[in-house]
């Protein structure tokens, strides 16, 4: 499956997550930082995974811009999935998480979600990723590859 993993990362945690997902998806997977992503690459993908840290209850501005700039209907025949990195703190739930907002924008552009939005935990604002999160991300990716 031709998979494109588009990510943004502030402290490197979401980048590590994106690379773990790509490795689990196999040879057909490409990882691209959101600043280098474009609609042409998205159009060639069978699967688009968008990954962002949660910042103030939402994805980064760069990820939001990328998703909002995709041409209408550009994801019509594309399977999609949304992931984020997030804190475990209970107060964060008040603001929500990036993955849900990413998933909404992917659907708005015609994408077919093949998994619910997924969050992966970091130990603090700057990380690191919590224990076993990279392994959990790999297992998650193998699960969506089977769909």
Report residues per predicted region:
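FMN-binding flavodoxin-like domain, especially the glycine-rich phosphate-binding loop
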Residues: 3-4, 13-16, 22-34, 44-147
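Local sequence-structure signature of Cys/Sec-based thiol-disulfide redox active-site neighborhoods
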Residues: 7
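Donor nucleotide-sugar binding loop of glycosyltransferases
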Residues: 10
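Acidic, amphipathic alpha-helical patches
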Residues: 38
């Amino acid at each position: 499956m031709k998979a494109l993993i588009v990510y943004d990362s502030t402290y490197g945690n979401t980048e590590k997550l994106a690379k773990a997902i790509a490795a689990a998806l196999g040879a057909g997977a490409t990882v691209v930082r959101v600043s280098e992503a474009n609609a042409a690459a998205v159009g060639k993908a069978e699967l688009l995974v968008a990954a962002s840290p949660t910042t103030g209850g939402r994805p980064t501005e760069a990820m939001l811009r990328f998703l909002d700039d995709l041409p209408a209907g550009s994801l019509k025949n594309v399977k999609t999935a949304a992931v984020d990195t997030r804190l475990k703190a209970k107060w964060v739930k008040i603001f929500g998480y990036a993955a849900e907002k990413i998933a909404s924008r992917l659907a708005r552009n015609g994408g077919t979600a093949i998994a619910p939005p997924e969050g992966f935990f970091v130990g603090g604002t700057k990380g690191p990723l919590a224990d076993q999160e990279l392994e959990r991300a790999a297992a998650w990716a193998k699960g969506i590859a089977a769909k």
